[in-house]
Each structure stands twice: as C-alpha cells, then as structure tokens.
Design a protein with these regions (language model features):
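N-terminal signal peptide c-region/cleavage motif recognized by signal peptidases
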Residues: 20-22
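Residue-level hotspots at or immediately adjacent to binding/recognition sites across diverse folds
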Residues: 25-336
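Bacterial N-terminal signal peptides that target proteins for export
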Residues: 1-10
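Hydrophobic helical h-region of N-terminal Sec-dependent signal peptides
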Residues: 11-15
C-alpha cells in the first residue's frame, strides 16, 4: 500500500469549499449577473494591487477595493477562485477549480482566461510569478504548471522528487508493466501543493499535505524536501525577517531560521487550523484560521486578538491606509 492511500479526508482551509467542484461550473459565465451579496459570500483570498485590494472566492467572484469601497467586477469564469497574486500594481493572476487561471492587466478591473480544463478536475491552490513572464501555479495532487511567457502558455510538470520513496519504487515497477495505469496512478500520488512563496533570498518554499515542506534554489525546477518532524497538512508559509513560519492543520505552527533545519513549534492557545498569514512592515505577524480565530505572533508566543464564532477566516491583507481586512466563509470584514 502506498502512503498516498493512507490520506485522511481532511480538506484544507475551510474544507469542502476548496476541493469540491461548483455545481454551477457548467453555466455560461456570460449569463451570470453580478451578485449583490458577493461581499458577504465565501471569499478565499485577498491581495494588494497597488493602493487597492482584490478579493476572490466562490462562483468566480472578484471584488475590487478602490476609493474605500468594495465593488464586484465581471469575470469570465464561475468556478471557485482560491488564490490571487499581483506581480505589480497592474498585472495579476487568480487561480481556482477546474485548473483555472485568469489574468488582469489593469489592476483587477477586467480579467481574461489563460487556462481552464474541466478534464483536469483539480483545483489550483496558489500562483506565484518571479518575473513579468515567469510563473508557477500549484494545486491538488501535485498539480504544477509553469509559464515563461506571462501565462500565454502553461506547461505541466511532474516533480517525482516530492514523492515518498515507496511511491517512487511503486511507480517505476508500474511503468514497466502498464503505461496507462502508471500515468493514472501518477496523477494521484503527489500530495496537495497548498502554498508557494518566494523567500527574500529568491528561494521558493512549497508547503502542502502530509507535512510536506520543500525548498528550491532554481526557480522550482527541482525541490528538496525538508524534514521538520510533522506529518499533518501545511496550508501556508511566510517569512518574517530572518525566520520562516509554516502553518496548518489543528493549529500546528512551526518556526525556523533561514537554514530550514532548526524548527521550533509555536504553541497556540487554540487548535483551529491556520489558513492565512500577514506580516507588516514592522514585522508584526498575524495568523487567521478556522473558528474565526485571529492571532498575533511574537517570536514563538501567540495571543488571541479575536474569535468570531460560526465562520472560518482564510485570508488577511492590509489596505493602503494600514487597515486590516479579513476574508472567509462569510465574506469580507474588518475588526471593530
């Protein structure tokens, strides 16, 4: 039996919202009207776009925060969008279900499809560009696509170095016996890739399911797995000065120096899964998670800022005036 067969049914972040395909995926997006309640619907990420903010979520919803107001903008998709990233003030990408990638060249005002495939049946969970043309999108079951032309074309990659040793041997044996079955099995053996970040020294850090933390010093061409003694899912990662934090299931948060070899667990006063993180210019670190939890972190000490019952918080961002915004299962909000 391979390690992948032992996976639990735990979904990341806010559970099924991220991994189930929308019932409306077969609808024509041109027939879907702007939703008046989009700001209070499921939203899964927020990103800064110059002086503005852009939030993404269910049914292809994209909201733009401009002139201190949130306004929904039209998009060409109605699949769930899980992550949004801006390389500069104008150029941004959002990813989501059905291997969807959409692109904006005007700060989030308008969007076009760069990639989408219902045949892939996997969601992208993150996207990262390290130049105007070069970027990577990652997602469930090892989904990994690369572009070298700003997203005009995307190429699939399989990173065997991130498999368990047992699975590598299993695939090698299977490939010699049945090529079709080999390709089918290969598509489901890698863990979910949940977050990809670029460190200050230009290395890429990838975190995901089954305690996967991996680092690359060649822009994601190859990765080296990092062993930090935990086998639960990691949902996010962030750099704070000379420290790296990874976070995930049931309130598990770990901190290391830049060597990624000296990990300490950060004791949280909660067991809620941690989904999102933000570091300010003053190196203040905030974490958000399930059960409406918002935490501030000082080195390895954690303090609860608030707990909002009945909702899950997935993302946090700061606007141009320094105000914090949160996104999650009940949409966008600020703390009073």
């Amino acid at each position: 039996m391979t390690f992948s067969m032992l996976r639990s049914a735990v979904a990341i972040g806010i559970c099924a919202c991220l991994y189930t395909t929308s019932v409306d995926a077969q609808l024509d997006p041109l027939t879907v009207q702007i939703q008046p309640l989009a700001q209070s619907s499921l939203l899964l990420d927020i990103a800064n776009a110059g002086d503005n903010l852009v939030a993404v979520g269910q049914r292809g919803n994209v909201l733009l925060y401009k002139n201190e107001q949130w306004q929904q903008v039209a998009t060409p998709v109605i699949t769930h969008l899980t992550k949004v990233f801006f390389f500069d003030d104008l150029n941004g990408w959002a990813v989501g279900h059905d291997a969807t990638i959409i692109h904006t060249k005007d700060g989030g005002e308008t969007w076009s499809v760069q990639m989408q495939s219902t045949k892939i049946e996997k969601p992208f969970m993150d996207i990262r560009f390290y130049s105007e043309n070069d970027g990577i999108a990652v997602g469930a079951y090892g989904l990994f696509y690369r572009t070298a032309d700003g997203g005009k074309t995307w190429t699939n990659e399989f990173h065997q170095e991130l498999l368990f040793e047992e699975d590598i041997g299993y695939l090698n044996d299977l490939k010699a016996e049945d090529e079709a079955l080999y390709l089918s099995e290969r598509a489901a053996l890698l863990p979910h890739f949940n977050r990809l970040i670029r460190l200050a020294d230009s290395r890429l850090l990838l975190v995901g399911e089954l305690g996967m933390v991996a680092v690359s010093d060649d822009n994601g061409q190859t990765f080296t797995k990092v062993d930090f003694g935990y086998e639960g899912s990691m949902f996010n990662a962030i750099q704070v000065a000379d420290s790296i934090y990874v976070m995930g299931l049931r309130g598990n948060v770990f901190k290391s120096d830049l060597s990624l070899s000296d990990w300490q667990q950060v004791d949280l006063p909660v067991e809620s899964s941690i989904n999102g993180a933000l570091v300010t210019q003053n190196n203040d670190l905030y974490l958000v998670g399930n059960a409406g939890i918002v935490l501030s972190i000082d080195d390895t000490k954690a303090e609860i800022i608030t707990r909002r019952q009945g909702e899950n918080i997935v993302a946090i961002a700061k606007d141009s005036k320094g105000q914090l915004w949160f996104a999650g299962s009940k949409g966008l909000f600020q703390l009073n």
